Amino acid sequence: VSRSRLAREPSAPPAWAVRSAAVLYAAALFVITVLPIRWRADLGRYRNNWRPQLVPVWNLAVNLRDGDRRLATLAGAVGNVVLFVPLGFLLPLLVPRLDRLWRTVGAGFALSAAIELSQAAFPGIRRPDVNDVLMNTLGTAVGFLAYRLLVRVRA
């Protein structure tokens, strides 16, 4: 956290707290989105059943209409939004250049896309889904808006 950011935003949390939160968040994000990675000999079995979801919103719409999959689909979408809210809040505190919505959302989009690509490169129980990128990006925007509200309100 830049000292100049903290000097300009007296309502910002202490630098050590922001850095600690960022480290914990990064570790949790890695565990939740990338692990477990399968490195065993039976990897081919996972590759054969593996297909990325590349059509935005279609799969969400279909699954939300299906009573058996509705709750799991809704929980997954909400979970993906919630997962990236801390990123949208922490980024402007950590990187002063990311003090604009579009910059922070762009960084969230890039990170989410990188995570999804890593899921394609290292198959495990995860599979890439374009809807995850969309929901994660929305979560980043929500986090940034919360940052704007909370930092300014506390001032």
Enumerate the language-model features and the residues they cover.
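Bulky hydrophobic segments
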Residues: V1-I125, F144-A155
